[in-house]
Amino acid sequence: MAFLKKSLFLVLFLGIVSLSICEEEKRVGEEEEKQEEENEELSEEELRERRAWLDKLKSLGKVVGKVAIGVAQHYLNPQQ
């Protein structure tokens, strides 16, 4: 009878340890998924910021180009 009790306790103990390890791995996996989602969100925000800067730079380049063309035409045709 004592042998059966010890065996039963051993099985229950190993089952509980196994269950706690699985739960811990599950929590770690969920935390990693959350971290990846946050990183994706940050990268999306960074992409939006970069696009905004590129749009501003593009429009600034257009303005500078028009001014340069106007200045060049003024110096090439000073009579106007």
UniProtKB/Swiss-Prot annotation:
It comes from the Eukaryota. It is found in: Secreted. Expressed by the skin glands. Residues 27-46 are annotated as: Disordered. Has antibacterial activity. The keyword Transmembrane does not apply. GO terms for cellular component: extracellular region. It holds the Pfam family FSAP_sig_propep. This is Raniseptin-2. It comes from Boana raniceps (Chaco tree frog). GO terms for biological process: defense response to bacterium. Its main location: secreted. Residues 1-22 form the signal peptide. Residues 23-49 form a propeptide. The keyword Secreted applies. InterPro entries: Frog_antimicrobial_propeptide. Belongs to the frog skin active peptide (FSAP) family. Dermaseptin subfamily. Transmembrane segments: none annotated. Keywords: Amphibian defense peptide, Antibiotic, Antimicrobial, Cleavage on pair of basic residues, Secreted, Signal. Residues 30-44 have a biased composition (Acidic residues).
